[in-house]
Design a protein with these regions (language model features):
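Sequence/structural signature of outer-membrane beta-barrel proteins
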Residues: 30-32, 58-66, 95-103, 115-119, ...
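Detector for outer-membrane/organellar transmembrane beta-barrel domains
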Residues: 49-50, 125-233
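Outer-membrane beta-barrel architecture
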Residues: 40-44, 77-81, 111-115, 160-164, ...
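Residues that define the transmembrane beta-barrel architecture of outer-membrane proteins
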Residues: 33-41, 70-76, 102-110, 153-159, ...
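Bacterial N-terminal signal peptides
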Residues: 9-18
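Outer-membrane beta-barrel "beta-signal"
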Residues: 110-112, 248-253, 261, 271-284
Length: 284
């Protein structure tokens, strides 16, 4: 699996600050059929004054095609969060997909996270979060790579809610994201090159209008098994698609290693896609 030269530059930018500050470095990747590959990396830089900077990079390769960097797309992002109090955190983020394969986008969002209490009954340290933002797309060809007469440039306005808590020895997480409106409805046959599915490393194509996801994990000192389930709907389809994942994370010193499987189940069983994922995290 080959990655572009820009990836090496990003890795240097992410890794070099680690010698001078406290933070967490993580990389996730998946491999699939016909050369499909996706990779994400981020460095959580804690400035120790309530401010946390998190630069991120993503890479997505659709196939083994040699043309145009093997059909690949990159995404760059920055998340800035500030701990207002012990219970409240505010953040803002921006993500940019530069023009590649007749597609580009820019996303910006802001949100808050709140811990209402630290322990009550069987629940410990619950976290609630709300986010709102917009994404602007520019699409110059349809899903069959035929050029469009006029570029399709919609803006989507979205909202996102998240919740996380420990219930005895289980860790529960949930995410719901919904597009409130598109500035113009996505026409049939026009797609995006980069769409996120909660708890999944793999990247999918298409305008995702709504998604809901839950994840269950059983953390222990050295091993944490986990499983995730996602239900999502494209803007041009009435039916929902499903994705599931499962895996095991191993903890050694300040390092975490995890491996698992991600399965995407569209409307037709023949289109099922299976990916093998791996994640490495290190604290400094």
């Amino acid at each position: 699996m080959r990655f572009p030269k820009t990836l090496l530059a990003v890795l240097v930018i992410l890794v070099c600050p680690c010698a001078f500050c406290y933070g967490q470095l993580s990389f996730s990747g998946v491999n699939g059929e016909k050369g499909y590959a996706a990779l994400r990396g981020q460095y959580k830089l804690d400035l120790d004054n309530g401010l946390v900077l998190t630069p991120e990079y993503g890479y997505y390769r659709r196939s083994d095609k040699e043309e145009d960097e093997a059909g690949s797309t990159s995404r760059y992002g920055l998340n800035v969060s500030y701990e207002v109090t012990d219970d409240w955190t505010a953040y803002a983020l921006a993500r940019w997909v530069p023009l590649a394969l007749d597609f580009q986008s820019i996303e910006y969002a802001a949100g808050v996270r709140w811990i209402p209490f630290y322990k009550k009954g069987m629940f410990k340290a619950p976290l609630l979060g709300l986010q709102a933002g917009q994404t602007r797309y520019d699409v110059y060809s349809d899903a069959q790579d035929n050029p469009l007469e006029h570029a399709y440039s919609p803006t989507e306005t979205f909202a996102r809610a998240e919740a996380e808590t420990y219930a005895r020895k289980l860790r529960l997480r949930g995410i719901y994201r919904k597009v409130i409106k598109y500035s113009s409805q996505p026409p049939s046959g026009v797609s995006t090159n980069w769409a996120d599915v909660p708890f999944m490393v793999a990247v999918v194509q298409g305008f995702i209008k709504e998604s809901s996801a839950v994840q269950l994990a059983y953390p222990t000192r050295n091993i944490t098994p986990y499983a995730s389930w996602v239900r999502y709907k494209y803007a041009d389809h009435r039916a929902f698609a499903t994705a599931v994942s499962a895996g095991i994370a191993l903890h050694f010193w300040d390092m975490d290693f995890s491996g698992g499987v991600e399965v995407f189940e569209p409307k037709r069983q023949a289109n099922r896609r299976t990916y093998f994922s791996m994640t490495v995290e290190s604290k400094f």
